[in-house]
């Protein structure tokens, strides 16, 4: 999901707005990491992603008056090969996920953020 209603949502900002927040001292980019996998017959496959995005959004909103913070859309293709036999699962290779996180971190720095918070909800 892409949250465009939150004031801390990167996806809802223009490029100049992102840069303005990122270039402030102490800026933080929060990247929620979830998964898309089976959770039995009773829960949605996006449970981990839904939960981590909610926690990240609420946390970032609570500190936004005191800290320059933005929140990316969640990364939803985690590392879950052990769930594949049950169906309802999309997984990445571990190295692919690791590379993606490194590239997100490099992009955060390139945009001017001082720090990065990878929030693992899986």
Model segments located where?
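Active-site histidine-anchored catalytic micro-motif
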Residues: 8-11, 77-121
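Active-site and ligand/interface coordination hotspots across diverse enzymes
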Residues: 1-44
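Short helix-capping segments at alpha-helix termini
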Residues: 61-67
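Residue-level signal for alpha-helix termini/capping positions
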Residues: 23, 64, 109-110
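Short catalytic helix/loop segments, enriched in acidic residues and glycine
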Residues: 48-60
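Glycine-rich loop at the start of a catalytic domain that most often binds anionic cofactors/ligands
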Residues: 42-50, 84-85
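Short coil-to-beta-strand
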Residues: 24-33, 67-79
